[in-house]
Swiss-Prot record:
This is Profilin. It comes from Ananas comosus. InterPro entries: PFN (IPR048278), PFN_euk (IPR005455), PFN_sf (IPR036140), Profilin_CS (IPR027310). Belongs to the profilin family. Keywords: Actin-binding, Allergen, Cytoplasm, Cytoskeleton. The keyword Transcription regulation does not apply. PROSITE patterns: PROFILIN. It comes from the Eukaryota. PANTHER family: PROFILIN, PROFILIN-2. GO terms for molecular function: actin monomer binding. The lineage of its organism: Eukaryota, Viridiplantae, Streptophyta, Embryophyta, Tracheophyta.
Length: 131
């Protein structure tokens, strides 16, 4: 299966009639493995800051998580495993695997729990596969 198929079929899938606003799978070096058409144009330093928070949990809390210039308030995640952010009625979930970051961005009516489930389920599967 191609990386794009993981984004299209697993991240952008429909859940209770809803789906993520955008999603991507990125390498730890900020390279795009696959992304949805409307995934934000991000800066490498934004991805570096996200990776730093996985190594040093809490480092994003004072400044917020930025993706494509959009600031998300960091909310409870799982240190070193998952980072979650909130902005208005939407938010972001980032799951780290050995080689990649799985990123899902959502807005209402999708719920944070639905976004977390989609992103973390794929991340867990990729970890089991050695990625």
């Amino acid at each position: 299966m191609s990386w794009q198929a993981y984004v299209d079929d697993h991240l952008m899938c429909e859940i209770d009639g809803q789906h993520l606003s955008s999603a991507a799978i990125l390498g730890h070096d900020s390279t795009v493995w696959a992304q949805s058409p409307n995934f934000p144009q991000f800066k490498p330093e934004e991805i570096s800051a996200i990776l730093n928070d996985f190594e040093n949990p809490g480092s994003l809390a004072p400044t917020g998580l930025y993706l494509g210039g959009t600031k998300y308030m960091v909310i409870q995640g799982e240190p070193g495993v998952v980072i979650r952010g909130k902005k208005g009625t939407g938010g972001i979930t980032v799951k780290k695997t050995n080689l990649a970051l799985i990123i899902g961005v959502y807005d209402e009516p999708m719920t944070p729990g639905q976004c977390n489930m989609v992103v973390e389920r794929l991340g867990d599967y990729l970890l089991e596969q050695g990625f």
